[in-house]
Every structure is written in structure tokens, then in C-alpha cells.
């Protein structure tokens, strides 16, 4: 299968993107819960 992303598999891009999104959301909620969200 040949996709438009080149040598990088689409599922790998989706997985990395998902992990980054979950990580950012987790950091955001953790920061706001611990009182650091207002400074960010």
C-alpha cells in the first residue's frame, strides 16, 4: 500500500498524534487541577 505520507505509515502518524493530544490534554487538566493552569 502506498499512501500520501511517504515512508511513514498512516497508523503510526495517527498513533503519535493521538498520544500527543492525550498528553497535552492530560498536562492541561493536571495544571488546571493543581492550580498552575492560570499561569499558563
Curated annotation (Swiss-Prot):
It comes from the Eukaryota. It is found in: Plastid, Chloroplast thylakoid membrane. Pfam families: PsbJ. GO terms for cellular component: chloroplast thylakoid membrane; photosystem II reaction center. InterPro entries: PSII_PsbJ, PSII_PsbJ_sf. GO terms for biological process: photosynthesis. Keywords: Chloroplast, Membrane, Photosynthesis, Photosystem II, Plastid, Reaction center, Thylakoid, Transmembrane, Transmembrane helix. Coiled coil: none annotated. The chain crosses the membrane at residues 8-28. It is a single-pass membrane protein. The keyword Membrane applies. PANTHER family: PHOTOSYSTEM II REACTION CENTER PROTEIN J. Belongs to the PsbJ family. HAMAP family: PSII_PsbJ. NCBIfam families: PRK02565.1. One of the components of the core complex of photosystem II (PSII). PSII is a light-driven water:plastoquinone oxidoreductase that uses light energy to abstract electrons from H(2)O, generating O(2) and a proton gradient subsequently used for ATP formation. It consists of a core antenna complex that captures photons, and an electron transfer chain that converts photonic excitation into a charge separation. PSII is composed of 1 copy each of membrane proteins PsbA, PsbB, PsbC, PsbD, PsbE, PsbF, PsbH, PsbI, PsbJ, PsbK, PsbL, PsbM, PsbT, PsbX, PsbY, PsbZ, Psb30/Ycf12, at least 3 peripheral proteins of the oxygen-evolving complex and a large number of cofactors. It forms dimeric complexes. This is Photosystem II reaction center protein J. It comes from Gnetum parvifolium (Small-leaved jointfir). The gene is psbJ.
Amino acid at each position: 500500500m502506498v499512501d500520501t505520507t511517504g515512508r511513514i505509515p498512516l497508523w503510526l502518524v495517527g498513533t503519535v498524534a493521538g498520544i500527543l493530544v492525550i498528553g497535552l490534554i492530560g498536562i492541561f487538566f493536571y495544571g488546571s487541577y493543581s492550580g498552575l493552569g492560570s499561569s499558563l
